[in-house]
């Protein structure tokens, strides 16, 4: 038994990849549950748990590139607060328009807690046909700064403090027109009281909103509603189209939690979802959000760097999940969206919006928000209150992480899986290299007609390249049996693969 285990270990080491759990299962004779890939479910390299081995491969996580027109939504009106501390941007396929909601202030002040006056917040609305150039419709709904000629949707001095909205979503699961839009909003007008916390809201058009009469998650620590403690003011909403449910991600220091609902009315008690690592300060994991990607989940984590009060910054990192509930923090080595450099508008404090990325052509649009100032506990003088707004950063479709090899060649081999669909497509940069794919049986032997030599070489830069073999054979013939894929890369960067 020891000799067999050692042989398996040697073979895995020779391939350049070792999965200790797989070795233990093989040694103990355990059966590993085989994945069945739905048709069209893109497979990324953010996690490597569906990869069996790789050789001479480098994996890289990629940072989104900021648009030169940033901020695409800046503070140009008196009520558009320079600190856009929350926001959401969606694309309405039916109306073929981008829609944005973002924070501002009404010019009024209110006592949030005894002896503490603060600006009353507003929620602003804008639209765009290209996601870059935005218009502010004159809604005439609320009087702020002495006028109703504005784009204000919600004013918290008229809505029980409900203008602090982290996420607004257009719900593809909803059948009732009056509930097409959904949101979670924070109110703190009853500070430390039973009415302070997170409310759920619905709307037919994203402009006229109805909220629950009391919080669905309370701030007050003695409310008895939250097992893990009082919720904070950094929440987000995910519509889980894979499992047809709603997930609320909540701030319960020092960790993050989730709660689920099937009807957006009744919610489960919060359960820990994303835990702080050893040595991290209690406020470090500031916020997170999630979205469906393929047959799995990705998300963004707003991370507060506060160990050194003289260098306090906030940036955005990639996270991932298999079930939407428990989240992983891949060792990416770099943020998904970085803070800006000296001279740039977003130097100190970038945070994700409450919305998933939007595909536009061959790119993903990530909208992020920048509050002009540094977050506490910053103690230095390099700070400002000038700037802020909503920015745009773009990433290649599926371009979160890639595997690559030089001209000396490398290989990536998947674990066995079943699938639905007919054809294999890849997202890769191979215009100065060679990419070929062979199809193997469960034991690792090439299947007739699908060898490396039979594969037509890819020499292109494409986000959706159809992999073909001689005689135009299709993968469909193997849909009832387990297969593996082996990718051969020569000066190639591979981002994803999908069976359609």
Report the location of each language-model feature:
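Positively charged n-region of N-terminal signal peptides that target proteins for export
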Residues: 1-4
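Bacterial N-terminal signal peptides
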Residues: 6-16
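Carbohydrate-active catalytic/glycan-binding domains of CAZyme proteins
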Residues: 21-500
């Amino acid at each position: 038994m020891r000799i067999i285990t050692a042989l398996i270990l040697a073979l895995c080491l020779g391939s350049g990849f070792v999965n200790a759990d797989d070795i233990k299962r093989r040694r103990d004779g355990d059966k590993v549950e085989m994945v069945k890939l739905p048709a069209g479910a893109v497979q990324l390299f953010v996690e490597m748990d569906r990869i069996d081995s790789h050789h001479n491969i480098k994996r890289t996580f990629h940072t989104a590139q900021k648009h030169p027109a940033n901020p695409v939504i800046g503070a140009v009106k008196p009520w558009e607060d320079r600190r856009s501390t929350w926001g959401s941007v969606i694309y309405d396929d039916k109306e073929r328009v981008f829609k944005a909601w973002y924070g501002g202030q009404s010019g009024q002040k209110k006592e949030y807690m005894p002896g503490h006056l603060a600006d009353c917040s507003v929620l602003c609305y804008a639209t765009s046909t290209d996601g870059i150039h935005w218009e502010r419709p004159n809604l005439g709904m609320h009087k702020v700064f002495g006028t109703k000629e504005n784009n204000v949707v919600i004013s918290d001095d008229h809505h029980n403090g409900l203008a602090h909205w982290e996420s607004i979503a257009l719900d593809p699961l909803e059948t009732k027109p009056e509930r097409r839009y959904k949101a979670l909003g924070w109110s703190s007008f009853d500070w430390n009281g039973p009415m302070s916390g997170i409310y759920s809201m619905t709307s037919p058009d994203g402009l006229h909103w109805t909220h629950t009469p009391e919080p669905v998650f309370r701030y007050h620590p003695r409310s008895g509603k939250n097992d893990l403690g009082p919720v904070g003011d950094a929440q987000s909403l995910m519509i889980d189209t894979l499992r047809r449910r709603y997930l609320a991600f909540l701030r319960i220091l020092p960790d993050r939690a989730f709660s689920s609902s099937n009807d957006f009315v009744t919610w489960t008690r919060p359960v820990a979802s994303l835990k702080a690592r050893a040595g991290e300060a209690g406020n470090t994991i500031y916020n997170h959000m999630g979205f469906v990607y393929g047959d799995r989940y990705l998300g963004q984590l707003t991370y507060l760097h506060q160990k050194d009060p003289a260098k306090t910054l906030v940036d955005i990192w990639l996270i991932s999940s298999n079930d939407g509930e428990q989240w992983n923090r891949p060792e990416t080595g770099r943020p998904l969206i970085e803070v800006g450099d000296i001279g740039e508008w977003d130097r100190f404090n970038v945070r994700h919006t409450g919305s998933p990325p939007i595909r536009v052509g061959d790119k993903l649009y990530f909208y992020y928000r920048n509050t002009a100032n540094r977050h506490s506990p910053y103690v230095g003088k390099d700070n400002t209150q000038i700037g802020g707004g909503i920015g745009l950063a773009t990433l290649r479709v599926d371009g979160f992480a890639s595997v690559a090899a030089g001209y000396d060649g490398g290989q990536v081999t998947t674990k066995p899986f079943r699938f639905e669909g007919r054809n294999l497509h890849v997202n890769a940069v191979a215009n100065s290299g060679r990419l070929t794919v062979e199809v193997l049986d469960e034991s690792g032997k090439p299947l007739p007609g699908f060898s490396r030599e039979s594969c037509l070489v890819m020499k292109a830069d494409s986000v959706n390249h159809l992999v073909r073999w001689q005689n135009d054979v299709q993968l469909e013939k193997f849909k009832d049996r387990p297969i593996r894929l082996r990718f051969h890369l020569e000066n190639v960067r591979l981002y994803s693969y999908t069976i359609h």
